[in-house]
């Protein structure tokens, strides 16, 4: 299974290498039977479908119901800006073949999308943005943050700083403050889509508020 699906071909040749990296790791896209989306922004869902063809033909796509309704079941499109309409079209294009095949499975706020995987509603970046929790038998956990953080410096010290892609800046600031405090107190691993390599680590308190401590890795 996968958590998020990358950009596909939407953002140029420097991105969209998920399938290639899967193959380099010894896996094929048709072996993936589930993809859980943290949210439906194009850099997280664009890799689901390329040129109308599903890239994970044997996978169910799991997404928060609140997120699905915002992007797919949304009404009042005439009043939206051209940029928002473009984002909505990308969302529809990414999910269309899976919707047609009845392979999109929606989960409620804070519900488990799959066995051993939980979710935490972290709204603001998008209405249904959810962090995904990998539960282990020994009580440890790894929380896939999604877009709680957009870098390893400013927002750790200033959680109220938001980016243009955040749907609700006030909500995302509160979400980020909560997520950082919980990660520091819980001492669990977090994985951030926009954190620098290796992208996995811990949150620690420091003199300026928080800092990211990357997880040690072996080449």
Segments from the language model and where they lie:
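Active-site metal-binding loops of divalent metal-dependent hydrolases
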Residues: 5-8, 40, 66-67, 125-126, ...
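Short, conserved loop/helix-junction motifs that constitute active-site signature segments
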Residues: 52-58
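Core dinuclear metal-dependent hydrolase active-site scaffold
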Residues: 1, 106-137
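Short acidic/His/Gly/Ser-rich catalytic and metal-binding motifs that mark active-site loops
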Residues: 11-12, 70-73, 152-156
């Amino acid at each position: 299974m996968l958590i998020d699906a990358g950009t596909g071909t939407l953002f140029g040749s420097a991105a969209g290498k998920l399938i290639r990296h899967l193959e380099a790791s010894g896996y094929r896209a048709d072996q993936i039977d589930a993809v859980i989306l943290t949210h439906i922004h194009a850099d997280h869902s664009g890799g689901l479908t390329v040129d109308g063809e599903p890239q994970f033909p044997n996978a169910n796509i799991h997404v928060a119901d609140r997120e699905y309704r915002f992007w797919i079941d949304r009404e009042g499109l005439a009043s939206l800006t051209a940029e928002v309409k473009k984002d909505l079209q990308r969302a529809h294009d990414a999910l269309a073949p899976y919707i047609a095949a009845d392979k999109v499975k929606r989960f409620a706020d804070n519900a488990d999308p799959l066995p051993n995987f939980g979710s935490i509603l972290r709204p603001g970046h998008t209405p249904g943005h959810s962090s995904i929790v990998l539960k282990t038998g020994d009580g440890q956990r790894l929380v896939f943050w999604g877009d709680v953080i957009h870098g390893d410096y400013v927002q750790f010290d200033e959680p109220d700083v938001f980016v243009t892609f955040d749907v609700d800046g006030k909500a995302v600031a509160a979400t980020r403050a909560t997520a950082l405090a919980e990660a520091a107190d819980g001492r669990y691993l977090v994985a951030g889509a926009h954190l620098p390599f290796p992208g996995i680590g811990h949150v620690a308190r420091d003199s300026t508020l928080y800092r990211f401590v990357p997880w040690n890795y072996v080449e």
